């Protein structure tokens, strides 16, 4: 038998082959739906809806000196 050292503190370490036993099963992660459900309940709903208005300019901004050059 091995003598306990300061690094093992008397506990026997598992070798990689020992961790493949059937008793050492990994825990399954919960379904994604179950994880998202609590966060949806925490969301606050507002009384008023939010309206965003965006304006898009088709024309380029032209400097006054460029405009004069084009007209001449």
UniProtKB/Swiss-Prot annotation:
> Annotated region Disordered: where?
1-40
A single Pfam family it belongs to is SPAN-X
- Could you tell me where the Basic and acidic residues compositional bias lies? 10-35
Question: Which superkingdom is the protein from?
Answer: Eukaryota
**InterPro entries (UniProt xref):** SPAN-X_fam
Can you tell me which family this protein belongs to?
A: Belongs to the SPAN-X family.
**Protein name as catalogued:** Sperm protein associated with the nucleus on the X chromosome N1
Task: State the species of origin.
Answer: Gorilla gorilla gorilla (Western lowland gorilla)
Q: What taxonomic ancestry is recorded?
A: Eukaryota, Metazoa, Chordata, Craniata, Vertebrata
